[in-house]
């Protein structure tokens, strides 16, 4: 399917052309509306703080894709991509449009997803809430003028009605909340939730369909570029250090979360950043902290009467967020695109303490680890003992992938081949024992290893293949103790290390079985100890 198809616009145009619909308001104009409507409050730093109500994160069980004949055979149906028939969708869609038509004011934004013009999606966003429209303005790519915005004919339209509550019995939803993607009607329909991240991730899901169908890779990763134009991609789940490691003063940021990779190189899908704000401090994350200023939206942070912000207070949620335009960060590439990657870093926080701090992957190993998407999370048990739990998220972004995972893995494998990309697996987790016994790998050492991988110093260094995982481990890395490079050497009891390692290998193998026979060739060559 080509990106160059358009939203059916008859009813949508009626909403846009209403006398009380506000088109392409500036940040200041939206601030005035937000404050007048009591949607948010001004903070000491100049940002607007809003509350999203009972939904402080995404609602994955309420996300649907419409089963339209031209598209249904391409979708990887299941718990993530839940089907909704077209008749049910259209009934609800028209109810929402009629509901919005009764609203006194609406807010319209026109812009883009995709900073490479050859692969960009033209967007229109229709919002019930002014702060949601500011979120769209911050997160998507902004046109350079009102004239340009007015001439955008949308390939996809977000219709957002957070105060419209669905009736599951009548509307075919699971709850009052719904996020529905229709590839035929080119619409993302959102209702029953004020969590603005549904708009961002809805468009990412759309791009994860449209781009790969044109053999363009879409990726849930951060990306940066060095002074010589060398590009690095960082894949990793929450808590692996993706944001920290890709924010490098020596390199410019391309983007922090969503990217495409086409024949021209890597490009950011977004025009903004949606950063976690819990425990944010100027000392630890100055780039993000300095972006909390006029024009930025804070979600669910706690403010005091004097407008000061307590970033450590999780009263409403651990998932507090800041949404700001990418140009609020100083060290960025403009526009947000660069050449083909030289280096890919897969980040994992292994709380079992057995995966090497860094290893160089073959193409088959890269595809295996991309499909696995492993990290570990710490879950409290009934007796209060904290044990590591393995966590696998296919392609490091399972909730946002409409197509079969193998489509993304095959695209990545081909691109690694074509552009001779070096791929490294970096463990930012534990060494010398599992969580509670071992210690966290020093961030200083991790930075040193990543820096040398990206600079090319590790490309032709000497490697040994470890007996346990079959991974290629560097024999020596400048400024990093050799004792930590091979994890077995950091454990006092080698038998305990092997038992823990083989347990993790079995978990990987069990997880990989879900992909079936179509990935046997990857498992045979890329799995541990192959």
UniProtKB/Swiss-Prot annotation:
Its cofactor is Mn(2+). GO terms for biological process: gluconeogenesis. Mn(2+) binds at residues 201, 220, 257. Its EC number is 4.1.1.49. It catalyses: oxaloacetate + ATP = phosphoenolpyruvate + ADP + CO2. One of its GO terms (cellular component) is cytosol. Substrate binds at residues 58, 195, 201, 321. CDD domains: PEPCK_ATP. Coiled coil: none annotated. Binds 1 Mn(2+) ion per subunit. Keywords: ATP-binding, Cytoplasm, Decarboxylase, Gluconeogenesis, Lyase, Manganese, Metal-binding, Nucleotide-binding. Pathway: Carbohydrate biosynthesis; gluconeogenesis. PROSITE patterns: PEPCK_ATP (PS00532). InterPro entries: PEP_carboxykinase_ATP (IPR001272), PEP_carboxykinase_C (IPR013035), PEP_carboxykinase_N (IPR008210), PEPCK_ATP_CS (IPR015994). ATP binds at residues 201, 220, 236-244, 285, 321, 440-441, 446. Gene3D superfamilies: 3.90.228.20, Phosphoenolpyruvate Carboxykinase, domain 1, Phosphoenolpyruvate Carboxykinase, domain 2. It comes from the Bacteria. Disulfide bonds: none annotated. GO terms for molecular function: ATP binding; metal ion binding; phosphoenolpyruvate carboxykinase (ATP) activity. It is found in: Cytoplasm. Pfam families: PEPCK_ATP. The keyword Methyltransferase does not apply. Involved in the gluconeogenesis. Catalyzes the conversion of oxaloacetate (OAA) to phosphoenolpyruvate (PEP) through direct phosphoryl transfer between the nucleoside triphosphate and OAA. Belongs to the phosphoenolpyruvate carboxykinase (ATP) family. This is Phosphoenolpyruvate carboxykinase (ATP). It comes from Staphylococcus epidermidis (strain ATCC 12228 / FDA PCI 1200). The gene is pckA.
């Amino acid at each position: 399917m080509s990106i160059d198809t358009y939203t059916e616009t008859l009813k949508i145009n009626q909403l846009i052309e209403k006398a009380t619909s506000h088109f392409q308001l500036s940040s200041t104009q939206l601030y005035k509306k937000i404050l007048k409507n009591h949607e948010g409050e001004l903070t000491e730093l100049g940002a607007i703080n809003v509350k999203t109500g009972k939904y402080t994160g995404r609602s994955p069980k309420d996300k649907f894709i419409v089963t339209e004949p031209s598209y249904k055979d391409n979708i990887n149906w299941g718990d993530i991509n839940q089907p909704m028939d077209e008749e049910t969708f259209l009934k609800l869609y028209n109810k929402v449009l009629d509901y919005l038509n009764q609203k006194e004011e609406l807010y319209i934004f026109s812009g883009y997803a995709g900073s490479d013009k050859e692969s960009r999606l033209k967007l229109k966003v229709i919002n019930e809430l002014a702060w949601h429209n500011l979120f769209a303005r911050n997160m998507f790519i902004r046109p350079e003028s009102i004239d340009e915005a007015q001439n955008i004919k949308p390939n996809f339209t977000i219709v957002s009605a957070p105060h419209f509550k669905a009736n599951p019995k009548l509307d075919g939803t699971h709850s009052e909340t719904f996020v529905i993607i229709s590839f035929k009607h080119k619409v993302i329909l959102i209702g029953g939730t004020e969590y603005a991240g549904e708009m961002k991730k809805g468009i990412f899901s759309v791009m994860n369909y449209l781009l790969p169908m044109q053999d363009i890779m879409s990726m849930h990763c951060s990306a940066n570029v060095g002074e010589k134009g060398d590009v690095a991609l960082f894949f990793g789940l929450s808590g692996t250090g993706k944001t920290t490691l890709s924010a490098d003063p020596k390199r410019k940021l391309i983007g922090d979360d969503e990217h495409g990779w086409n024949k021209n190189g890597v490009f950011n899908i977004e025009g903004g950043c949606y950063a976690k704000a819990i425990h944010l401090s100027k000392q630890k994350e100055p780039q993000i902290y300095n972006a909390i200023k006029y024009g930025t939206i804070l979600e669910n942070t706690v403010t005091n009467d004097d407008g000061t912000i307590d970033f450590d207070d999780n009263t409403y949620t651990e998932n507090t967020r800041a949404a700001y335009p990418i140009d609020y960060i100083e060290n960025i590439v403009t526009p947000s695109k660069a050449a083909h990657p030289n280096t890919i870093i897969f980040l994992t926080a292994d709380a079992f303490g057995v995966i090497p701090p860094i290893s160089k992957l073959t193409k088959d190993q890269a595809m295996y680890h991309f499909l696995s998407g492993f990290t570990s999370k710490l879950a409290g048990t009934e007796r209060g003992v904290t044990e590591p739990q393995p966590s696998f998220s296919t392609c490091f972004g399972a909730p946002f992938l409409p197509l079969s995972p193998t489509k993304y893995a095959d695209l990545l494998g081909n691109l690694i081949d074509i552009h001779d990309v070096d791929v490294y697996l970096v463990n930012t987790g534990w060494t010398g024992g599992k969580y509670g016994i071992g210690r966290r790998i020093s961030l200083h050492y991790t930075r040193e290893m990543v820096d040398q991988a990206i600079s090319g110093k590790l490309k032709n260094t000497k490697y040994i293949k470890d007996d346990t995982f079959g991974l290629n481990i560097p024999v020596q890395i400048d400024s990093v103790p050799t004792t930590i490079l091979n994890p077995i050497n950091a454990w006092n009891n080698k038998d305990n290390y092997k038992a823990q390692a083989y347990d993790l290998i079995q978990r990987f193998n069990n997880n990989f079985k879900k992909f079936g026979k179509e990935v046997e060739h990857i498992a045979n060559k890329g799995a541990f100890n192959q």
